[in-house]
């Protein structure tokens, strides 16, 4: 999981 929660 990425440190940011975007739908990229």
Swiss-Prot record:
The name this protein goes by in its record: Allatostatin-A2
Native source species: Delia radicum (Cabbage root fly)
Organism taxonomic ancestry: Eukaryota, Metazoa, Ecdysozoa, Arthropoda, Hexapoda
Gene Ontology BP annotations: neuropeptide signaling pathway
Keyword terms, alphabetized: Amidation, Neuropeptide, Secreted
Residues with the Leucine amide modification: 8
Subcellular localization, as worded in the UniProt entry: Secreted
GO CC terms, sorted: extracellular region
Entry keyword Cytoplasm: no
Record function comment: May act as a neurotransmitter or neuromodulator.
UniProt key word Secreted: yes
Expression across tissues: In larvae, expressed in the CNS and midgut but not in the ring gland, thoracic perisymapthetic organs (tPSO) or abdominal perisymapthetic organs (aPSO) (at protein level). In adults, expressed in brain and thoracic-abdominal ganglion but not in corpora cardiaca and corpora allata (at protein level).
Record-stated family: Belongs to the allatostatin family.
